Amino acid sequence: MCIRDSRCNDGGFLLGVMGNHTASAGVIYFPCGMVDMSDVKGGSVDLHGNVWREIGEETGLGRADLTEEPGWHTVFIGPRIAHIKVMHARESAEVLRERILAFMAKDKEPELADIVIARKPADCSDRVAPFVMAFLHSAWSNS
């Protein structure tokens, strides 16, 4: 899942820096998560439900804050597959970042250590996950 700031049409994306206590410490991803057994229903994986559960757990944002872009984007990097759901926000990236940081501050051990705003490749460090960079390059070249 990725959050794109559509209010100012600046192409900004919000990325989460994984906390030091996580298996992916310091890696930068879209605020999202892995599928877990609670996402498996009737032998199928509920990716849509996973997106909303994870976004709420990691950022405190919900359906009142975000609008889904239709469809999914799929990125293949070697043996890995990432399914990405783009979400549009009415608030600016800066305002959303502050809201998410305030939400994270209430958690004793938040999964994310920080939120980064990416509007162009220069905003991305070498810690950004390869599938995220692949998606961002595609999104920026098509906007």
Feature map (PLM): residue ranges:
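Conserved small/polar residues in nucleotide/adenosyl-binding loops
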Residues: 1-3
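Conserved Nudix-box catalytic region and its N-terminal flanking loop in Nudix hydrolases
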Residues: 11-53
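Active-site segment of metal-dependent pyrophosphate-handling enzymes
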Residues: 20-22, 27, 56, 60-104, ...
